């Protein structure tokens, strides 16, 4: 796999992960304003974590001799309903992991990038499982009980 393809994939991650971090921070503040303190804290931490990955991916682009771009981001939706948000975030994780699996396969000959992406993949997979678990919990205990747990 050429450095150009790896750099392009890392740049895609930088742009989209920065967007996700912004989205998670905004959702955190929306949830805090509504009194959903546990969700607010979770997504604030998640935004910080994602920014850390953005920094690592930027550094790797530079290590590979690439040029980092500050690309336009598409507009994202802000959710008022926490359950709608969890469903949306879960789908983003599912779709992202499918794409990331292909990127991992492409990066297998660049062990440093591969290892970085593998750590990120595991983290995103954990987030996906959390979202799925929350939706299962809502089915078991009901919406109101789940919402009460988020306060």
Regions found by a protein language model. Name each.
Residues 1-151:
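Iron-associated oxidoreductase/ferritin-like identity signal
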């Amino acid at each position: 796999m050429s450095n150009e393809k790896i750099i392009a994939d890392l740049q895609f991650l930088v742009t989209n992960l920065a967007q996700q971090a912004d989205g998670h921070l905004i959702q955190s503040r929306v949830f805090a304003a509504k009194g959903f303190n546990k969700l607010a804290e979770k997504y604030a931490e998640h935004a910080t974590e994602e920014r850390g990955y953005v920094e690592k991916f930027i550094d790797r682009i530079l290590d590979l001799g690439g040029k980092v771009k500050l690309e336009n981001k598409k507009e994202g939706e802000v959710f008022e309903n926490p359950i709608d948000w969890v469903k949306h975030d879960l789908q983003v994780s599912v779709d992202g992991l499918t794409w990331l699996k292909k990127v991992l396969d492409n990066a297998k000959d660049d062990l440093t990038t591969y290892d970085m992406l593998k750590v990120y993949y595991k983290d995103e997979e954990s987030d996906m499982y959390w979202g799925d678990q929350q939706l299962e919990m809502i089915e078991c205990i009901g919406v109101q009980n789940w919402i009460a747990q988020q306060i």
